[in-house]
């Protein structure tokens, strides 16, 4: 297994798909990385040379991935909660943040129904 950005990349998958195992890299980003490195999308990870893997590592160093990205997201949500804006309050109450209605739906976020006690 090749190790890129602290993540073990599966050997038998195509490079384009294997790079998406890294948090913060989706299919479009992986395609940009491979285009910049000059590697074919259909190449398997096991067929990559050490030089190609190093090229990919160098390109990924410039992108915010894994721990840094998780930390940034966590801090931005915490900032919203600290300034007590609407989005921050919705995060704090575990409700939908992006304007979805929560009168009848939003069961996934709210959790299971609570029984009505008389």
Curated annotation (Swiss-Prot):
Residues 94-118 are annotated as: Disordered. GO terms for cellular component: cytosol; small ribosomal subunit. GO terms for biological process: translation. The keyword Disulfide bond does not apply. Pfam families: Ribosomal_S13. Disulfide bonds: none annotated. Keywords: Ribonucleoprotein, Ribosomal protein, RNA-binding, rRNA-binding, tRNA-binding. SUPFAM superfamilies: S13-like H2TH domain. GO terms for molecular function: rRNA binding; structural constituent of ribosome; tRNA binding. It comes from the Bacteria. Belongs to the universal ribosomal protein uS13 family. HAMAP family: Ribosomal_uS13 (MF_01315). Located at the top of the head of the 30S subunit, it contacts several helices of the 16S rRNA. In the 70S ribosome it contacts the 23S rRNA (bridge B1a) and protein L5 of the 50S subunit (bridge B1b), connecting the 2 subunits; these bridges are implicated in subunit movement. Contacts the tRNAs in the A and P-sites. Part of the 30S ribosomal subunit. Forms a loose heterodimer with protein S19. Forms two bridges to the 50S subunit in the 70S ribosome. This is Small ribosomal subunit protein uS13. The lineage of its organism: Bacteria, Fusobacteriati, Fusobacteriota, Fusobacteriia, Fusobacteriales.
